[in-house]
């Protein structure tokens, strides 16, 4: 509906809609109050002597690297795709696998806090339309976590600075 309204109001052509899965990568938000799971676990792993993770790690998610999202957006525009398109890996990746990958890189143990919620059991995108149209993410979860950790370690000061615009504007409003 938003695209139809935009088209009517501005007389522009078609509108493209992408729905990215859990996006991660360099330059992400590592602020513990607002970070998503991968940057949050990376920060915890490299600022503590153990990696504390909520739940039991069984939750399944779909992750996609930020570069693959950018590539997917360009793909959608260049191919004039006007139907909503999911951008994810389509891979079922457990939080346990994410935590183990990060803890191994940091050379620390994992402590599972099963008194905290695990989250929804499974949230994975249907990538059949993207597959049919020819879009396939290129960065594996292991490669993506590795380059996100490398960026984080080289840019900790910037990474640990909040990028929450609402926090920054709180006193100005």
PLM region spans:
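Short-chain dehydrogenase/reductase
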Residues: 31-39, 62-63, 92
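Hydrophobic alpha-helix immediately C-terminal to the catalytic Tyr-X-X-X-Lys motif of short-chain
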Residues: 2-6, 37, 41, 98, ...
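C-terminal substrate-binding subdomain of Rossmann-fold SDR/epimerase-dehydratase oxidoreductases
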Residues: 46-173
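Flexible, glycine-rich beta-alpha linker
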Residues: 13-37
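Amphipathic alpha-helical recognition patches that constitute DNA-binding helices
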Residues: 19, 36, 40, 94, ...
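Active-site Tyr-X1-5-Lys
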Residues: 1-21, 42-48
């Amino acid at each position: 509906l938003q695209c139809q309204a935009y088209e009517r109001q501005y007389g522009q052509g078609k509108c493209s809609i992408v729905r990215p899965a859990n996006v991660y990568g360099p330059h992400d938000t590592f602020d513990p109050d607002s970070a998503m799971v991968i940057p949050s676990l990376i920060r915890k792993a490299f600022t503590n002597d153990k990696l504390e993770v909520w739940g039991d790690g069984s939750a399944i998610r779909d992750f996609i690297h930020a570069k693959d999202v950018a590539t997917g957006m360009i793909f959608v525009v260049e191919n004039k795709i006007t139907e909503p398109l999911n951008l994810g890996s389509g891979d079922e990746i457990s939080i346990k696998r994410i935590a183990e990958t990060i803890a191994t890189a940091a050379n620390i143990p994992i402590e599972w806090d099963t008194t905290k919620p695990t989250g929804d059991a499974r949230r994975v995108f249907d990538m059949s339309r993207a597959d049919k149209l020819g879009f396939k993410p290129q960065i594996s979860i292991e490669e993506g976590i590795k380059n996100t950790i490398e960026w984080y370690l080289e840019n900790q000061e910037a990474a640990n600075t909040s990028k929450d615009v609402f926090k920054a504007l709180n006193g100005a409003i």
